[in-house]
Every structure is written in structure tokens, then in C-alpha cells.
Amino acid sequence: IGFDATLGYGGHTKAMLQCLQGKGHMYATDVDPEESAKTKKRLEEQGFGEDMLTIKLQNFCTIDEIAKEVGGFDFILADLGVSSMQIDNPKRGFSFKVDGPLDLRLNQQKGISAAERLDTIGREELAGMLYENSDEPYCEELAKAITDEIRRGHRVDTTTKLREIIEKTLDFLPEKEKKETVKKTCQRVFQALR
């Protein structure tokens, strides 16, 4: 009996199912309902049905409950992080490279989007989040710019708007440093908000 903590596209699960050769069962969790449904369908079409695979739409932190339910696991795989499927989809709001809603949630039916979070967060808390979650060296300047924009009545609700604020905030940098610094800063800010 195996457990894949983050089903994603299902590549690891498929490889493990092939190794089991029909003599075992895989359990997999993922919090993304959209990708889980696609992966389930794709694996079923490849011959890996419910008799071999159980997919649970939940966080892998429930592994203890699942293990008790099934009597434990012989092996566990956890490939943690956001998948390229999520990053490449502009509707998910994970990438600063393309315009999309500033969402950043793995499961868009749960919790609040990054844009909604920015609507309610104060300058100090945002600066702390940027520093703590991504070691952002310009955390104070960025927090001020973002919260000032919101205070003026302009929502930061798209990936492009957030990127533009970052670019404007770092406009003081020498031209030869600016492009790379803006890119790295965007990466850190999006990471911190996730």
C-alpha cells in the first residue's frame, strides 16, 4: 500500500502503480479539485481505476487519519510545491509573467484569494509577511506601496497590477540591475503571498 501526498499530474502515482503491477493499492491526496479531477480521469483511461487508486481531495496533513483507515502504508512519496500546471494557468494567478486574477490558492473554493487578503492587511503585517515568508529585502518599501495603492481605492487584484507596483517601487535602481532585481522580487513577493 502506497501513499502519494501530492497527486498533481499523477506522474509519480502512475509510476508506483505500474511497479505494483495490480498487486497493491495507492492512496493519493491533493487540495486542487480541478487538477485532481483531470488526473483521476487520465489515470482511469490508462487502466488505473478505483480498484487500484483512491484519490482524496484533502491536504496531505491528514495522512495519519488515512493510515489508520487503511492500516498503514508501505511507502510514502511527497513531491511538495506548486506544480507547473498551476503556474502555467493564468486563471490561477500564480505567475507574475502573465495577467490573471491575483488568487494564489491551490483550491480556489477554500479560503480567500491573495487579492482579498491584501484588501484587509495592514502595512506592518504585510512587510512582516514579505520578510518572514521570503526574506524580501525591499519588504518595507513594497508594503507601503501596496497598502498605499489600496488605501487610494485601487484594488491590487491582478498579477499585472502587483507586478507593476513592484516595478514602480524599484524604479530607483540602476538600469543594469533593475530587470533582474524586479524579476527576483516578483518571485519572492508571490511566494510570500502564497
Model region roles, listed by residue range:
Residues 1-194:
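S-adenosyl-L-methionine-dependent methyltransferase catalytic core, i.e., the SAM/SAH-binding region
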